[in-house]
Amino acid sequence: MDKLFIKSDVLLKDSFQLAWNVYESGFEPNYIIGVWRGGAPVGIAVQEFLNVLGIKSDHVAIRTSYYSGIGERKDSVQVYGLNYVIRQLESEDRLLIVDDVHDTGNSVAQIIADIAAACKKNTPEIKIATPYYKPNKSQTGNKPDYYIHEPAQWLVFPHELDGLSLEEIIENKPELANLIDKIKHHI
């Protein structure tokens, strides 16, 4: 499997660029959802950057459950942690959903469906932002409103270790160099 190892500084740079793209578009979200796990650091950077530019927003992380391992998916997407946002949202609000990658689109589609079902007439304007978009993997036809890259490879984000070989960790995770001797028998 061809893998793209994303460095933390590159992800942060892309997150700030993503925020700038949102800002330049004129969309001013007053709510931002970062999709836990990978969308949380991207969402934090987007929120911070927009805040510096004068766009204030309430921001939370929610969780979806869909992947059970590299390339292995469960049958349906479960969304956790939307209660706070649903209680707050009004129809005139603007919600930005931020994730690390938009591939099948199923997770974001389920988040939007759950928000729409709960908010009904109070469903706000919703836009999607992600540094990485995989149009060839889409199962929903949804396209993020804001994205930076269209990679074909399997993405390995800075925090990800599960499913990597010891050789991949040594080669692509220099931040672990001082711990390799201590952890190699666990891998």
Question: Where are each of the predicted segments found?
Answer:
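PRPP-associated nucleotide enzymes
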Residues: 1-187
